Amino acid sequence: MLLSLTQMLSSRASSRLFLVSYLLLWENVVSTSTCAEKDATIQDSLEKLLTLTTFMSQVVSSETAKLFTEFNNQYAQGKRYNDRIPGTCHTEFFDTPVNKEQSLVRTPETLLTLVHSLLNSWTNALNHLVNEMSTMQGDTSSLISKAREIQAKFDELTTGVKIVQSMIGERDIATYSAWSGLASLQSSNEDVRCFSFYTMIRCLLRDSRKVNTYLEVIKYKMVDQNNC
């Protein structure tokens, strides 16, 4: 199963195709509440989508870690950024469980809304991350390519989460936390720009790991335990 999912997610088009396929499949099925008894078709579709979405979140988390490592190696060596007082992430507004144990006490519906909100909060930020990174000194082509792939998969994850919410009859009440770091990314001071990118990618890594953890818990509760 892991190998086939890796192959499915090897290109942007293929992963989006699978999400759209599940969306089209769901248009022919009447939504039901999480706690209601589901027929085999609904449960099977839900399991497949959650498996795909959870694995995709693992891929995103891994790709974000690679982006952070590459940026750190290329721009942050010897600058002791870890010793500086870091700026807070723009998603600090959300009441997020800090680990899997805390996540397990939340309902799947609550976690789905939280995941959706976190993903929404990075839409604008990721767009600027991709567009502004070329202003850094040196060759940024690899960094930009990685950031674009992450941006695309965030969009696909958002689609997957919205489909899951529709499948369980959950009303979409996701919100977002506005990102306001553009001025720092466009600063004329190279060190300010560099530290801003460093902090931004660090926050992206933190949130991508949270999304992965929450989706794993959602899958555990809704598929492995088959309860609510």
Curated annotation (Swiss-Prot):
Leader sequence segment: 1-31
Pfam families the UniProt entry points to: Hormone_1 (PF00103)
Record-annotated disulphide pairs: 89-194, 203-228
UniProt keyword terms in alphabetical order: Disulfide bond, Hormone, Secreted, Signal
Major location category of this protein: secreted
Entry GO CC: extracellular region
Annotated GO MF terms: hormone activity
InterPro entries xref list: 4_helix_cytokine-like_core (IPR009079), Somatotropin/Prolactin (IPR001400)
Database matches in CDD domains: prolactin_like
Compartment annotation: Secreted
Domain of life: Eukaryota
Gene3D superfamilies: 1.20.1250.10
Tissues with expression: Expressed specifically in placenta. Expressed at high levels in trophoblast cells from both junctional and labyrinth zones of the chorioallantoic placenta the last week of gestation.
Family: Belongs to the somatotropin/prolactin family.
PANTHER family the UniProt entry points to: PROLACTIN-2B1, SOMATOTROPIN,PROLACTIN
Protein name (Swiss-Prot/TrEMBL): Prolactin-2B1
